[in-house]
Amino acid sequence: MIDAKWVYTWKTDEQGWIVKAKSRLVARGFKQREGIDFGEIFAPTLSSSSVRLLSANACELDLDLWHFEVDQAFVQSHLDEDVFLRMPKGCGNLFGKVVRLNKTLYGLKQASRTWHSHLIRCLEKPRF
């Protein structure tokens, strides 16, 4: 079982006035234990030299490159294992209760790996 907490972000203008406030629920994944709370956590990343080489090859061959961002990427992918989360204050009548997560949450050790697996499955679909 993993605890959760709220993370708050405030955006301010030039005078320091708050113009936007956000909050998100994150898992306190640093308390997860390998082999008990999660299995594999490896997710490949692209080095900056690989990105430069890819860009140079695309320019030389006059190819188009596409770059995209995925909003809330980690919370798009399903978990492979059962993860139970204790809800923090600020969750109304769920405070203190334990819930089972269906999808990943920021802060989980396996979030990067599950997102990578989800992305690969989407890219391998015929209509991509």
Where do the model's predicted regions map?
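Long, low-complexity, charge-biased intrinsically disordered regions
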Residues: 1-128
